[in-house]
Amino acid sequence: MGSNSGRTTKLPLVPLPKGSVLLPGITLRIPVSNRPDLANLLSTIVDRSAVAKRDGTAITFGCVPLSSPYLSKDGQRLIDDGSLDEDRREEFDMIDAGQSRKEDLFRHGTIGKVIGIQRRAYSEPALVVQGVQRFTIRRVLKERPFFEAEAVVHDEKVSGDAETVELFQQLRQLSRELLTLLRLSSLLPSPGSRLSPLIARKFELFITKSDVSHASRLADFMADVADSGFEEKLRILASLDVKIRLERVVEILTRQLQSIKSNVKVTTITTNSFPSSGFDINQIDPRDREILARKAMAGLSGLTPPGLSAGRNNDNDDKESNEVDELQQRLQEAQLSPEARKVADKELRRLRKMNPANAEYGVCRTYLENIADIPWTKMTEDQLGPETLKRARKQLDDDHYGLEKIKKRLLEYLAVLRLKQSTNRDVERQIESLSKELEASDGGDLEKEVPVLSETDRVAVETKLHMLKTRRMGDKSPILLLVGPPGVGKTSLARSVASSLGRKFHRISLGGVRDEAEIRGHRRTYVAAMPGLIVSGLKKVGVANPVFLLDEIDKVGGANFQGDPSAAMLEVLDPEQNHTFSDHYINIPIDLSKVLFIATANSLDTIPAPLLDRMETISLSGYTTVEKRHIAKRHLIPKQIRANGLSDGQVVLSDEVIDKIITSYTRESGVRNLERELGSVCRFKAVQFADAGDAGRLDAYNPVVSMDELEEILGIERFEEEIAEKHGRPGVVTGLVAYSTGGQGSILFIEVADMPGNGRVQLTGKLGDVLKESVEVALTWVKAHAFELGLTADPTEDIMKNRSLHVHCPSGAIPKDGPSAGLAHTMGLISLFTGKAVPPSVAMTGEVSLRGKVMPVGGIKEKLIGALRAGVKTVLLPHHNRKDVKDVPQEVSEGLEIVYVTHIWEAIRQVWPDAHWPGQHTHFIESRL
């Protein structure tokens, strides 16, 4: 029976890397990179080291492993995997030794003695520490800048009772069998990976010469050599009773030997002729013991584990091993998800056993490098301070003029993010308080005595804790689709969003993508397989919450023999699914819920309905003339002046000149052509400025661009603007039109003429089918109400008898279509038949029905701007379009008199207020349908 006594001392502590346990008599490398606590500890004891050397003692500190969620902190009770809370598992996976708290430490540790500093090529420096003596933490005195605790150091004594002696003999027998297996060269494929005869001889001498007084050291040594798990080593460290420790090590060795023998047919050889004199464990070189342990843990795979080489002079093996060590360090720093950690550990074990010359070695290493490059948990912290919304609004306004809808939606998202962050902060504080209370009752608080909670109180606290965890608000970023014509700033707007949020930005061009594998990656079985565009983008930005621009999503290829790329985007753009997005190459769930996706498209027609349903659509209309003028003055003109080598003030364009360029030389929804034309103007002035400078007459240079110069610079006008007539005439009405290219509107004259005939109606002006039907509806209404309008003397008389009509819309080369000219056609027919002229300062738009109702139409904003520019004073609009006038610039709404009508009779009274119509009081009751 082993016993131990202890003495209390104050001890600095060093948390060991995750998965590492230091036992007495064993050496361990502790990397010093990314370990501020270790650096602070070493700098603190560096003064003591001089004194220590004079006293003949070494530098020592306590080496404490991190606790395991599957084992109680005292190492005596295993926790069932099924009962383990998922949050505790994830919390353990995220623990880093350099950032650990006292709650993360195991209760037992080993005093370590620094025996050297090791630095290999291509590898980080590390302290080489040898375990000396077990200790138990009583209470932690401080956590920062390094841990310091009050600990009980245990002095071990091994009793010589029969049961202990029997266990010791059994341990020696099992150790010999393991040594025999290690020495069988037939199990090892290459001479370079065989166990060195010198190391084997030292190992054999140590096992044979050990007597029962060395039982504790032999048990610790074999526990480190054997293929034991992290929790098993923690239990051995916590076994202060030598007898219990022997039982556990015997169990581990028995299991490992049975596993080896089940796979390989082995004849066991034992040796009995060894002297029984005492033997010191330090006779075995620490590096030799480390090599021996790593070979045993490799499971007799035949390959030397990374970080070690069988021969001392094998530089190539050292280089390959150090590369794998570096890869392991990168994986540890990557803070992988639990699923990714499990896969990475498995692949890393495979990589350690592979020969670097093996073709699969490069594939496996590339796969692990890709996993390490993915930002699993690293995120950009959103700038969500008190000035967040104000700063974001200013950023968006500085970068883009107009586009109020999308700006409003993005500011809403920022406000929601800020509120969620505030709520989560309060919830986390409550969770932390309850967790500490629960851990203290379990004996986790080492500093003070806390009464144990009753079962009822424990259940109540755990229930409240669970409810608080469900109150955490997740950040599901919206998935926005910006739809609009080319050149309106969809792509640059997404970049401004990232800038206002302070996030990384990445653009993915989807135009012409026809292979599903480009989105989701190729399977690892293919040669040169790589991740898809989404995962590659995450690797490039290096954070898990960037802004992704999916450009031209409407131009993604359809289904073909290579798959359907648009179908592959369904999982990416579904907020309910993309937190477990699976790339074919990585084949591990990746959380995309933190990514803010902004897609752009010119049209919705080619986007599949299921994909469109997953996105929040925001339509961006083309810029109006007023907006283009502001954009030109604030952005385009200064940009072109700088691009052409000029300075501010060397090119001056008045509002009149800018408007002339917009209306007469461009007709587009965006501003790309406008920028080109402004560039032409700047280059023209640059030539003039250069000529004046060469001639020494800079004072003669005129920076102002006049209207007369425009035709010389840009050529003849490409588009002629319609201007309102000064005099009205019967049959001519001013309508309103919004160009299909978007962004611009104008007036459109509708001319109606009659002639003797047989009732035929002729339509010219390149009119579309809908516009032709609109003329027919207008004519039918006028014919049906000819008596009420005073056009016929009898209700049964046909106004079209012996008469034919010709309806024409000027600018015959331009296609025209749509129902919005119905009201103008009706008023034109009434004007022709009554001989009353429609005032030229009045324009109108609206669809009409056979009942005479005026129904809403689109393009109101563009039409009103065009009407004001053409000199119109009054505009008749459908009553249901009142809501659209809110989007009109203030200068337009104030410059026009806007009249809303619901019926043709209301429009008639507005156009001819002084005229009398026989049936104007009965039109709401009477119906001719």
From Swiss-Prot:
Span list, region Disordered: 302-325
Lon proteolytic domain segment(s): 727-914
Segments forming domain Lon N-terminal: 11-257
GO molecular function: ATP binding; ATP hydrolysis activity; ATP-dependent peptidase activity; serine-type endopeptidase activity
Pfam families tied to this protein: AAA, Lon_C, Lon_lid, LON_substr_bdg
Motif (Microbody targeting signal): 927-929
E.C. designation(s): 3.4.21.53
Catalytic residue list: 820, 863
UniProt cross-references to InterPro entries, sorted A to Z: AAA+_ATPase (IPR003593), ATPase_AAA_core (IPR003959), Lon_bac/euk-typ (IPR004815), Lon_lid (IPR054594), Lon_proteolytic (IPR008269), Lon_Prtase (IPR027065), Lon_prtase_N (IPR003111), Lon_prtase_N_sf (IPR046336)
Gene Ontology cellular-component annotations: peroxisomal matrix
Described purpose of this protein according to its UniProt entry: ATP-dependent serine protease that mediates the selective degradation of misfolded and unassembled polypeptides in the peroxisomal matrix. Necessary for type 2 peroxisome targeting signal (PTS2)-containing protein processing and facilitates peroxisome matrix protein import.
Name of the protein described by the UniProt record: Lon protease homolog 2, peroxisomal
